[in-house]
């Protein structure tokens, strides 16, 4: 697969054959493909897999994040009784997946519990919202090491986005079970 991705990157279209044989290439209209992408991602989350959706533009990311969040809310996987505005203009509630967009090495940016207590909040980390506080701060649990941290209202407003979908560049460095594009 590694050799194949290098061949594909260099323009060798025969490299697509491996992906097609494995059932990783799908055709359809853009709307159909996005619908399947969202459904497959939701199935990943329901199965407990760390999954991310990658898109080439921020507009596609915004659209995919909205679609995924809407389905999760309709299935009660993300709550709407108390929500908070994020830096990407989305609203997040308990159960939503968010991504932090700035490092926070201050005392308030250190995690508690999990397998890496004391880790700082990093740009690109993926979290699940566990509590929305009255002061508009969020308590979040790290997707991988399970540590929790309370993000200040200002940090949430300026540096936190929905984290179901990301641009390819923004997702660099993430380790997941499933990547959907």
Would you name each region that the model predicts?
Residues 1-123, 128-139:
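Conserved helicase motor core of P-loop NTPases
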Residues 104-181:
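Conserved helicase C-terminal RecA-like lobe
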